Regions:
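Generic recognition of stable, solvent-exposed alpha-helical segments in well-folded globular domains
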Residues: 11-14, 31-38, 83-97, 110-117, ...
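Charged/polar, low-hydrophobicity segments characteristic of intrinsically disordered regions
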Residues: 3, 10, 45-55, 124-135, ...
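Solvent-exposed loop and edge beta-strand segments that line ligand/cofactor-binding
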Residues: 1-9, 67-87, 130-148, 154, ...
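Non-catalytic C-terminal accessory modules of carbohydrate-active enzymes
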Residues: 113, 120, 197-335
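Long, well-ordered core segments of solenoidal/helical folds
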Residues: 1, 32-52, 113-133, 157-177, ...
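Active-site acid/base region of carbohydrate-active enzymes
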Residues: 7, 22-84, 102-148, 253, ...
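Alpha-helix C-terminal capping segments
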Residues: 166-172, 190, 294, 303-306
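Well-ordered alpha-helical scaffold segments within catalytic/enzyme domains
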Residues: 12-28, 87-105, 149-159, 185-194, ...
């Protein structure tokens, strides 16, 4: 049976973007840029005069919510609705960043312009001022964590709108909740808005898998017999990239940003593979300070960020101690 899921083509662009930053293999991404442009061109053909998306054939699956028939969000049968628009905006911005680094500034500018045009249209169609949230549909009858998370990640929510969306997402009231794989995007949004406490709480689903006799991550909430699904293993990524806060800040992992978020945790440590070796990080809350031990491979450098402080880090082992204080928002260099 032929099965086409258009939204996965946008996720593929995000995977290429991640690969470009996390590995030293730029050539693989360069060879895929024609395909990335083709995917974006196909989606942009479906943008209507009012800025909505329509006419995208296939199975427009987004997430396995029980309330969404076939995993399709409101207004999403033909690729419409807020979430797919935000996904397209995010993919356009990711592609723009790739084009810039790969020497195509004109293509980069084009993709940024189209993302900004969509942002204006999506806000006009889906923003609900009284609720301070983006609706899933133009009738403003449905609201989800999916749309709010993607609005944050795609930079569609900015300024006062970002503050309102962040409050609404952290409160979680009246929102359809993400399920297993899509919670990755929720966790990425939590990272940006200081929601580490909510992130750690939502990990309870994965903690319960062992109690059910499972040794692998499942695709969808019960009842489910898809018992081994790689996309559901993203908490491993978030332990290193969000809790320990280890992320590349330049293509090829040439520079590193370490911005830990422990929440109520007292300590965390881990060792992450790097193109030049390994990055080891240990962080510990001690009274009113955060103490860290960071080891970077030869030829690497970066910064350690915490509670408004920025400390340069270099190759080798170094100890860091900075004052601890609560922050409401956590800014990032990359979506």
């Amino acid at each position: 049976v032929r099965q086409t899921i258009p939204g996965f083509s946008l996720i593929w662009i995000g995977m290429a973007h991640d690969y470009f930053f996390w590995t030293a293999d730029a050539d693989t991404v360069r060879r895929r840029m024609p395909g990335i442009r083709e995917v974006l061109g196909r989606w942009l053909q479906q943008v209507q005069v009012d800025g909505s998306i329509s006419g995208m054939g296939g199975w427009n699956y987004l997430d396995w919510l029980p309330e969404w028939h076939g995993g399709i969000p409101p207004e999403g049968v033909d690729g419409g609705g807020a979430s797919f628009s935000f996904m397209l905006q995010l993919a356009l911005r990711q592609a723009a960043e790739l084009e810039k680094h790969l020497g195509e500034p004109e293509m980069s500018a084009l993709f940024e312009r189209r993302a900004n045009e969509l942002r204006i249209a999506t806000t006009r169609l889906y923003w609900n001022e009284s609720r301070g949230l983006f609706a899933d549909d133009r009738a403003h009858t449905s609201y989800s964590e999916h749309a709010q998370s993607l609005a944050i990640l795609s930079r569609a929510a900015a300024g006062i709108e970002l503050e309102q969306v962040a409050r609404g997402l952290l409160a979680g009231k009246g929102l359809y909740r993400t399920t297993i794989y899509f919670t990755h995007y929720l966790f990425e949004a939590y990272r940006m808005i200081g929601g580490i406490g909510q992130l750690i709480h939502r990990l309870e689903l994965w903690r319960q898998l062992g109690e059910r006799g499972l040794k692998t991550t499942i695709e969808a909430p019960e009842p489910s017999r898809s018992d081994c699904h790689a996309w559901a293993s993203h908490p491993l990524y978030h332990y290193f990239a969000t809790i320990l806060g280890i992320r590349p800040s330049a293509p090829g992992f040439q520079s590193v940003e370490i911005a830990p978020q422990l929440g109520a945790m007292k300590w965390a440590n881990g060792t992450l593979p790097h193109p030049r070796g390994e990055i080891a990080v240990e962080v510990r809350q001690e009274d009113d300070r955060l103490c860290a031990v960071v080891s970077l491979p030869a030829g690497s450098d970066g910064v350690f960020k915490f509670a408004g402080t920025v400390t340069p880090v270099r190759a080798g082992r170094q100890e860091i101690s900075v004052p601890s204080r609560t922050r409401r928002m956590h800014s990032t260099t990359r979506a």
